[in-house]
């Protein structure tokens, strides 16, 4: 379990988590100045955009140049071979999608690991969940064939699965969104409690009657991305100079979309004095914004596993097991918030 010497202070906790990320990742990137970052999250989940922005911030801070990026929907043959020689480090975007719950990123990961199994591949911090033993064993076979694959797990249980069941060279590392260090509140809160609850296959919580719960919503940015991607595919058929323009443009598009989604998420959460959420990055973004909040678990324990590994000492956070308990905990935080205002 992570021990922070300043757990009562949010700034101390965030500083300690950033230090831990550097202690784990910088030795793995020793001597590395160029890499590719694969698996951009082109969907509405703000948490994955927060991770992407944190990854990009970390790599910029430590002067690792990104030669190429793509999303997990990219056909494997579209990945440019001339950029992926055996001296190029492949970074796989982190998150919570190693397993059989979300098929697209897992299939993309397996294709990359199979095609480039002699390359140095670093899986940025992930949660792991397989519901089917056959799927787990199949992925374990891919991991064993991947000669220089390093898996960073973002909770203790994922680390156990990575080492004992996948046979991976694995290390424990916090979520890369913490590399953002802080996020803004754009305006004073307008309501006491914001409920941010999942509406997908990881959901196990129903919003209470008479409560209007939000989730990360479709922002329309993907439509602009789809149009631009068509233009960029045309450029790919032209000489190398235009292909270089394509790579630079695509990276900038990804960054713009990710930051747009993340800041929309900050605006949503910032409407409340207190947040109740079952999303892991509802929790992480609240910490980065300095907001009091209550967390509930998702379908397989991802949120509580992360909390118990890294953030259990946060004075801003309460863990609840039921909606009723979450409301009670939120009321306590709200009362404390109002006392500080007096």
Regions found by a protein language model. Name each.
Residues 1-342:
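Active-site anion-handling motifs in enzyme catalytic cores
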């Amino acid at each position: 379990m992570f021990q922070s010497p300043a757990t009562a202070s949010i700034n101390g906790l965030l500083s300690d988590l950033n230090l831990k990320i550097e202690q784990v990742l910088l030795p793995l990137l020793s001597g590395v100045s160029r890499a590719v970052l694969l698996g951009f999250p082109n969907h509405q989940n703000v948490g994955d955009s927060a991770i992407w922005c944190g990854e990009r911030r970390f790599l910029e801070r430590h002067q690792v140049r990104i030669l190429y990026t793509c999303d997990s929907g990219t056909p494997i043959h579209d990945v440019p071979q001339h950029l992926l020689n055996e001296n190029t480090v492949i970074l796989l975007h982190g998150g919570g999608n190693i397993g059989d719950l979300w098929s697209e990123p897992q299939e993309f990961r397996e294709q990359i690991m199979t095609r480039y199994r002699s390359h140095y591949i670093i899986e940025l911090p992930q949660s792991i969940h397989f519901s089917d033993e056959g799927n787990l064993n199949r992925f374990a076979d891919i991991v064993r064939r991947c000669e220089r694959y390093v898996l960073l797990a973002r909770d203790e249980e994922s680390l156990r699965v990575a080492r004992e069941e996948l046979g991976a060279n694995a290390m424990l590392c916090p979520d890369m969104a913490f590399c953002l260090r802080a996020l803004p509140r754009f305006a004073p809160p307008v309501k006491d409690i914001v409920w941010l609850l999942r509406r997908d296959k990881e959901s196990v919580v129903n919003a209470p009657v008479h409560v209007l719960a939000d989730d990360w919503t479709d922002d329309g940015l993907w439509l602009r991305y789809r149009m631009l991607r068509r233009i960029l595919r045309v450029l790919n058929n032209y000489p190398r100079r235009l292909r270089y323009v394509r790579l630079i443009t695509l990276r900038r598009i990804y960054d713009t979309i990710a930051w747009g989604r993340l800041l929309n998420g900050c605006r949503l959460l910032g409407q409340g004095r207190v947040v109740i959420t079952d999303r892991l990055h509802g929790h992480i973004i609240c910490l980065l914004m300095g907001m009091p909040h209550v967390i509930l678990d998702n379908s397989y324990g991802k949120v509580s596993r992360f909390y118990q590994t890294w953030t259990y000492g946060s004075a801003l956070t309460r863990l609840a097991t039921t909606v009723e308990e979450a409301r009670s905990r939120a009321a306590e935080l709200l009362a404390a918030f109002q006392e500080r205002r007096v």
